[in-house]
Amino acid sequence: DVCSSDLRESIMQKVISTKRAPGAIGPYSQAIEINNMVFTSGVIPVNPATGEIAEGVEAQAEQAFENLCHLVEDSGSKVENIVKTTVFIKEMNDFGKINEIYKKYFKEPFPARSCVEVARLPKDVLLEVEAIAWK
């Protein structure tokens, strides 16, 4: 494998997987734990029980953040331990609406965050979120 190295093989990695968040739709893990840090993949607003995607950015934000919280919790960490999030949004005009939902899940001191407008997301959802947390 081109990316393999002695360093990578010497670091303990643990794959994190949960049914309380949407499964991977490609060759990647839902999250990886390494040295007591949890790195999630992007989480989209798919209801993991039904596969349905809610209408509207607020409902999608609720589902995406709920999925992210479940993934972090099922890693053995907790939402309060999230130190960085990245939010990918389809429409920057939705930034304020997403912030209102974000504040329901994250409290001060808020995690560091990047927000990026993108042309398109998987399944044509309106946002995707990823996080880094410590354990």
For the regions a language model picked out, list residue spans one by one.
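Short, small-residue-biased leader/transition segments that mark boundaries at the very start
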Residues: 1-4
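Short, polar/acidic, helix-capping and beta-turn segments at strand->helix junctions
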Residues: 12-135
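Residue-level detector of intrinsically disordered terminal segments
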Residues: 7-11
